[in-house]
């Protein structure tokens, strides 16, 4: 059986508005459920309307009075991301919490986004870079917003080759996944630096779920036509290995801590406190050395603005 970590205290979030990407399943569902339980209004930003509706129904059944709504978002499409940003901007409500969670893992063969980018880089990283940029005015309007970006233990194997950022020459699915999650971690830290320098009032940090039992390990490998049944059987066998896996509510705890705890720090990185950060309650996580490279971070930001077409304001203080 997967590990179950003790629950954590979450402050009253009544009156707060949260947006969670990939909220219909896995860690996104767990985060949405816990935020709703604490009183937040949660917008589930999802690609699949039917799956989103099922998630809303399930959370609503377990959290009486939960304030939930759906917003279409396909992170593999910069046009969809822009449309999501426009829709939320037209609502005019400040966003208190943004959780950049949605992801895809190790599609085979190499797949591309609508805009021609390697799919993991596009969905896991670049799409969230663009979405956060579109929502920046609403986040700044909240006064003390939080942006939590969901990285992974696999960020440790990420390597930057800006001449082969899209894996065109040699595509290694797991390496590409690690790169996308390393990039997202670097984004979280750089967003905090820019917020501090510019007085944006946004606290940006990152979290990872450890080894959580989700459908991420199934949906990605079957994206290119792999056997869904065989992948599910394989993963059920892997999940039987004792001492490694934890359930979704536990895997969501680091993100919930990062999004709500008064002790969570800007630029921080949180994960499970157990063996090799695989399971357990939330605690500061080890930041890969590559995520601390300022020159690479600066270049990644410039490349991301160019590829996404989304520019961020100057991070200098405003009058």
Language model feature labels by segment:
Residues 1-225, 307-319:
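Rossmann-fold NAD(P)H-dependent dehydrogenase/reductase core
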Residues 1-4, 279-290:
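Short, contiguous pre-domain boundary segments
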Residues 21, 169, 173, 237-240, ...:
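A short, mixed-charge helix-start or loop-turn motif at secondary-structure junctions
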Residues 44, 73, 243, 289-292:
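Pocket-edge positions in alpha/beta enzyme catalytic cores
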Residues 55, 187, 251-254, 300:
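Alpha-helical packing segments of well-folded alpha/beta enzyme cores
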Residues 168, 224-239:
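A short C-terminal helix-loop "cap" of Rossmann-like NAD(P)-dependent dehydrogenase/epimerase domains
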Residues 180, 233-285, 295-298:
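C-terminal helical subdomain
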Residues 288-319:
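C-terminal amphipathic/interface module of NAD(P)-dependent oxidoreductases
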């Amino acid at each position: 059986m997967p590990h179950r970590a003790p629950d954590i205290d979450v402050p009253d979030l009544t009156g707060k508005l949260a947006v969670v990407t990939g909220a219909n399943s896995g860690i996104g569902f767990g985060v949405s459920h816990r935020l709703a339980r604490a009183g937040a209004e949660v917008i589930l930003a999802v690609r699949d309307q039917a799956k989103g509706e099922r998630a809303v129904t399930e959370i609503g059944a377990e959290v009486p009075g939960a304030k939930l709504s759906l917003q279409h978002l396909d992170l593999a499409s910069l046009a969809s991301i822009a449309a999501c940003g426009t829709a939320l901007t037209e609502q005019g409500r400040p966003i208190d919490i943004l959780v950049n969670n949605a992801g895809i893992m190790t599609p085979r063969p190499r797949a591309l986004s609508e805009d021609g980018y390697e799919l993991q880089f596009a969905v896991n990283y670049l799409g969230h870079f663009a979405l956060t940029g579109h929502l920046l005015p609403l986040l700044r309007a909240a006064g003390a917003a939080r942006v939590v970006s969901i990285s992974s233990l696999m960020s440790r194997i990420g390597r930057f080759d800006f001449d082969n950022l899209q894996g065109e020459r040699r595509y290694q699915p797991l390496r590409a996944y690690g790169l996308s999650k390393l990039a997202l971690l670097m984004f979280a830290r750089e967003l905090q630096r820019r917020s501090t320098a510019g007085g944006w009032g946004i606290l940006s940090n990152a979290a990872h779920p450890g080894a959580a039992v989700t459908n991420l390990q199934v949906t990605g490998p079957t994206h290119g036509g792999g056997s869904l049944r065989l992948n599910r059987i394989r993963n059920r066998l892997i999940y039987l290995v004792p001492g490694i896996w934890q359930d979704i509510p536990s895997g969501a705890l680091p993100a919930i801590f990062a999004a709500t705890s008064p002790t969570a720090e800007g630029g921080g990185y949180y994960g499970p406190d157990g063996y090799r950060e695989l399971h357990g309650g939330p605690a500061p996580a080890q930041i890969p050395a590559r995520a601390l490279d300022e020159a690479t971070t600066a270049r990644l930001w410039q490349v991301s603005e160019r590829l996404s077409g989304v520019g961020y304001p100057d991070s200098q203080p405003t009058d």
